[in-house]
């Protein structure tokens, strides 16, 4: 696990954007795993700027989002399809049919199970995910894989924790239906990605970040599963990294890694 600590949330977004662009420019038919929530918005803003300045094209890119609420239409203001259209897809040249968000409008269990299986199959048919972007919840969730989620789990129906429902309540109007269920990629699905980049910013994420990086491997902190991934990069701002016991060591490692990259082995 590579831990990179940067001065600010803006620096985290710039680093993540550079990684995404590198994948797009390296792979013939790049496949990205995308996330929603407040943290990736800054990343998507940077990607739009890079596209508008003609530094990148998404024409040959395929994307798969981590999750979607169950029981609301794609067109709903708070659906993750709407989120992605608003913050990224509508502003770049990605082909609409190459963008995938779990189909979760139905509330029929059988239909949702089939949708989950189809999503897994679509990822495989695309050749797997080259780079999966992640955020982290205050309880350590990734995607909507809440505490106690199996590390072997695949795309499935998941009940949201109370803390997740409360955290997302601000996005829904008073009296409006707020889903308590989601269709989400499983932890096993995420771990199948060839590379993972998790972004975390702000003091509110510091405890979850510490548990993920320095805590035990445990289903109680779903993000700790990234300890098992051979190409997981955790990019933090100073506030999110503030509780790490080995913070100075991670910074030292990154300094030495940069020297090696530049050919300096002193």
From Swiss-Prot:
Its EC number is 3.5.99.6. One of its GO terms (molecular function) is glucosamine-6-phosphate deaminase activity. One of its GO terms (cellular component) is cytoplasm. The keyword Hydrolase applies. It comes from the Bacteria. The active site is at 67 (proton acceptor), 139 (for ring-opening step), 141 (proton acceptor), 146 (for ring-opening step). It catalyses: alpha-D-glucosamine 6-phosphate + H2O = beta-D-fructose 6-phosphate + NH4(+). PROSITE patterns: GLC_GALNAC_ISOMERASE (PS01161). One of its GO terms (biological process) is carbohydrate metabolic process. It is an enzyme of class 3 (hydrolase). Keywords: Carbohydrate metabolism, Hydrolase. Pathway: Amino-sugar metabolism; N-acetylneuraminate degradation; D-fructose 6-phosphate from N-acetylneuraminate: step 5/5. Homohexamer. Belongs to the glucosamine/galactosamine-6-phosphate isomerase family. NagB subfamily. HAMAP family: GlcN6P_deamin. Catalyzes the reversible isomerization-deamination of glucosamine 6-phosphate (GlcN6P) to form fructose 6-phosphate (Fru6P) and ammonium ion. This is Glucosamine-6-phosphate deaminase. It comes from Marinomonas sp. (strain MWYL1).
